[in-house]
Amino acid sequence: MINVSDRDGTLRNQKRHWSRHAANYDDVFIDPFAEGVENPLWMALGAVADPGGKTVADLGCGTGPLLPSLAERFGRVIALDFAPGMLEQARKRLGPQQARRVRFLERPMDDLDDLAEQIDVAVSVNSLVMPDERLIDRTLRAIRRSLRAGGRVMGIVPSIDSIQYHSMLLLDQALEQGLTPAEARRFTAYHAEHRYYDFAFGGFRFEGLRQKFWFPFEVEYRLSKAGFRDLSLEKVLYPWHDLFGGDFDLKAHPPSWDWFFQAVA
């Protein structure tokens, strides 16, 4: 049984931390919409038929990087986030004219009962990151109930396996430079910032924020568990840059990634 008071306290703490990071979010976290990123979400959104007659919901919209495109393409747009600071930044990004076309909701992603069977496309970009797996499951079930029959969920989740891939490359470089295995592991742990991660359970902690990073099999498992079908997974490919632990000349290797998913209700 979930202790509701504990859950509410955790949500309040996370709302405060996410709001505090809202102004500099785009500078701190890797942007799946940045130039040079290969993001399958754009093609998936472009494939939605008759978007002008459909309702799209950006769940956990954050600072709203996707909202201008959604507002231009879809007939009705919902922007939901539990952090008021994020919604404030999203409104600023849109500007007054576009913001009037968007319905803003300040609430958690699992609070969708009043939207049951009203959404055609639900989008979640780096927002299914709750550190409690029970809340992730509850949120996915809520999203499925909010979708009309045949509606689609699509989104991006941060990848824990890409951190392990990055670590492997750094370890090899350190060994090739003559470090001992023990020295190479310390070098890798420092530059890949292992202190922030729980690799067994996909946990991430940074300046008060707590997030879930995903293995691909978890995406398949949890979406299926929530009742979704026809699931597909693709990589969001990021060019190597400073946020990946410094310039260690990794450009000769395949890029790092997050996971893009889409499924049908």
What is the meaning of each model-derived region?
Residues 1-51, 154-185:
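Conserved class I S-adenosyl-L-methionine
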Residues 57, 63-111:
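Class I SAM-dependent methyltransferase SAM/SAH-binding core
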Residues 123:
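A conserved beta-strand element that flanks and buttresses the S-adenosyl-L-methionine
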Residues 131, 203-218:
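Acceptor-substrate binding/catalytic loop of class I
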Residues 137-149:
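A short glycine-rich, Lys/Arg-flanked "PGG" loop and its adjoining helix->strand segment in the class I
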Residues 229-239:
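Conserved S-adenosyl-L-methionine
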Residues 246-265:
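Core SAM-dependent methyltransferase catalytic element
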